[in-house]
């Protein structure tokens, strides 16, 4: 999928409200499927295509059920945001020292997460090409 017309008539997992709106506007049918069910949905024909992070594309072995991959290298305007969440009630129940530790660890994970995602963005081409997918 490189241009809106590529989506027409396809069953696509968008993964977010905004992506779902774009898919619908382009003439695609949005199919809500959790990331961990994309593999079986692609295999069974419930989905024709899915949008998800490079990390998920690799870790869920989606190259086994696909023939094509549009990478985020030059065809993307978004980056997958994968936050670490904690309820306000749980956070407020921590001591100030514990809250400080949570914030410090969160900050260190942010850098790690961004770097790991960048590595996966580069690695995905290799994984999908090796599987015989056409990568653009």
Predicted features, each with a name:
Residues 1-136:
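N-terminal secretory/targeting leader peptides
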